[in-house]
Amino acid sequence: MAYRLLRALFRGLFRVTIDGVTDQFKHEKLIITPNHVSFLDGALLALFLPIKPVFAVYTSITDTWYMRWLKPYVDFVALDPTNPMAIKHLVRMVEQGRPVVIFPEGRITVTGSLMKIYDGAAFVAAKSGAAVVPIRLDGPEFTHFGRLQGVLKTRWFPKISIHVLPATTIPMPQAPRSRERRVLAGEHLHTIMMAARMATVPRETLFEALLSAQTRYGRFKPCIEDVSFKEDSYQTLLKKTLGVSRILQRFTVPGEHVGMLLPNATITAAAIFGASLRGRIPALLNYTSGAKGLQSAIIAASLKTIVTSRQFLEKGKLTHLPEQVNEVNWVYLEDLKDTVTLTDKLWILFHLCFPRRAMLPQQADDSALILFTSGSEGNPKGVVHSHASLLANVEQIRTIADFTPRDRFMSSLPLFHAFGLTVGLFTPLMTGSRVFLYPSPLHYRVVPELVYDRNCTVLFGTSTFLGNYARFAHPYDFARVRYVVAGAEKLAESTKQIWQDKFGIRILEGYGVTECAPVVAINVPMAAKVNTVGRILPGMEARLINVPGIAQGGRLQLRGPNIMRGYLRVENPGVLEQPSAENAQGELDANWYDTGDIVTLDEQGFCAIRGRVKRFAKLAGEMVSLESVEQLAISLSPEGQHAAAAKTDSAKGEALVLFTTDSEITRERLIKVARENGVPELAVPRDIRVVKALPLLGSGKPDFVTLGKMAQDPEMSV
């Protein structure tokens, strides 16, 4: 009777629902592993699961007053973490057929993300051979029984959902020592718990996700700021979004690709969400690519309109672009302010109260946004992402990193790059964190000062940018920073060292590609390994394809929820080319993406980048990584600029060419460094050319197309 009354009370107050594979509880040996978000979790599971399980509870909790009050109603076993026999007792209970609930985190979350996973539950599952049923609890964290007051917008009776995931097993790992087996089993369970989080993420559009964040963290929660130093709340950002959307629909149609040439600013975020909610697909244009790059993007994405700002064009010295690129309609935001009518204002006011009614019908799998590749190996390609792929990458990041609304992001990487867009805009907005948008990562003195002034805790950048910030920053500028992540290029040893020595901060290296929205792997404090880019993100499948001539590693191919919808190419304008990759048998597999990168994956799943397939030279039948050649030069001259290319050679097929800004680099010095590092002499170039500067793309990456031409033609210069 008491159970029925409590169940009815909870269902009435919290609108509790349970979904998923509820017949999973029929296994003979069963362990249930829920996430832990509040003090209500145990009561919810006891009341709503179709079985009566035993709860494994730490002795520090069993002695509390409320556990003594619950003892007549809930079956639990005291678990002493200091007693090794406690695990054996649990194993015996499972083997006897008693379903056991173990909270693998061991404590209630204080971040909203997964906490540390204890390996005890995993070892019990592996030892007993029990089925493991992960459960995802959503909603109790918003109650006053959680530990996220001040982090989330708490309320008395939020809706609670209990998601039951399919059962799985944890095989006993193969390792010589018991301690190693426990650790490996724990990592397996951590993977299961991360997959459970990813499996229960709601399928939303970008605009719906923004509204969900507003509900979750509060409409008046400050969320975004730019160089105007006026911080906007979710409500103010929504108002600007609705305003831009209302104006954009006058000169565009639903489904149209709309070019956007805008800086890192709040209005850019409003333009992206505003276009999206009215069914337009923003194409974020690289303003450093010049007229030629813009024309390629216009052709590939079939653009008719480009939205920009007169002030931005003037400050960026880009006023020549509208004259040189005159095949599209240029729309200036400044000109649109005076066109807002009373009807528009009333429309905005109404939809501030009912924002979901402003959105045109859309699905999560519909095209949401177009980004463009850097063009380092040919014409830039349009990369079309869906709402689902972009938001999946955000959730993958949030699953492994403990970002909270207490964090402040410094976002100086351009929003037209996937790295800047996903980690610098979407991730903080969907996490409730504050973000400061700065228009240029090249202001090496200003960015550290702003990090200090705005109390930023999260900083993303390339190795080059981070190295320069460290050179000009005061030792106290990064005192509050807890996450520094490097991506887009290999992290230089000198950059890593100066951050450690000057600020006491470990840079975490990551890896991504535009086609994956972009993050593929990342080191985080909970799982980091030196000289790797971290583990592949949860929800992604990875496979390595053998490349003839390359002994270590293989060509990385990926599949997952964050993979793009497809390419838009200059050669086939407006036609979406869906992703596919050639498997080991030479057959094309749909929905796989071939990164073109040679990587190795160790036994713990950590990924190390060896180079790009296109950046290997074949010398007398041997494959030599051009990046390894560049690393030799960097070790000799960390401050210089170096890039390697290949040229045709009648004797060996191809020969190496090193371009460098350091005139003191010689073949003899390179040979010495190569011997010290165990690099074969074959990887030391004979042709060393000193240049004033390397040819660079707008992204700051070397222009390998131009370098390849320079390698073939000794007379050609930058």
UniProtKB/Swiss-Prot annotation:
Pfam families for this protein: Acyltransferase, AMP-binding, AMP-binding_C
InterPro entries tied to this protein: Aas, AMP-bd_C, AMP-bd_C_sf, AMP-binding_CS, AMP-dep_synth/lig_dom, ANL_N_sf, Plipid/glycerol_acylTrfase
Single GO BP term: fatty acid metabolic process
Enzyme Commission designation: 2.3.1.40, 6.2.1.20
Sample GO molecular function, one term: acyl-[acyl-carrier-protein]-phospholipid O-acyltransferase activity
GO CC annotations, alphabetized: plasma membrane
Catalytic residue positions: 36
Region (Acyltransferase): 15-138
Membrane topology designation: Multi-pass membrane protein
Main subcellular location: membrane
Regions crossing the membrane: 258-277, 409-433
Record region (AMP-binding): 233-646
Known catalytic reactions: a 2-acyl-sn-glycero-3-phosphoethanolamine + a fatty acyl-[ACP] = a 1,2-diacyl-sn-glycero-3-phosphoethanolamine + holo-[ACP]; a long-chain fatty acid + holo-[ACP] + ATP = a long-chain fatty acyl-[ACP] + AMP + diphosphate
PROSITE patterns documented for this protein: AMP_BINDING
Compartments, record wording: Cell inner membrane
Keywords: Acyltransferase, ATP-binding, Cell inner membrane, Cell membrane, Ligase, Membrane, Multifunctional enzyme, Nucleotide-binding, Transferase, Transmembrane, Transmembrane helix
HAMAP family: Aas
NCBIfam families associated with the record: PRK08043.1
Family per record: In the N-terminal section; belongs to the 2-acyl-GPE acetyltransferase family. In the C-terminal section; belongs to the ATP-dependent AMP-binding enzyme family.
Cited function: Plays a role in lysophospholipid acylation. Transfers fatty acids to the 1-position via an enzyme-bound acyl-ACP intermediate in the presence of ATP and magnesium. Its physiological function is to regenerate phosphatidylethanolamine from 2-acyl-glycero-3-phosphoethanolamine (2-acyl-GPE) formed by transacylation reactions or degradation by phospholipase A1.
Protein name (database record): Bifunctional protein Aas
Gene assigned in the entry: aas
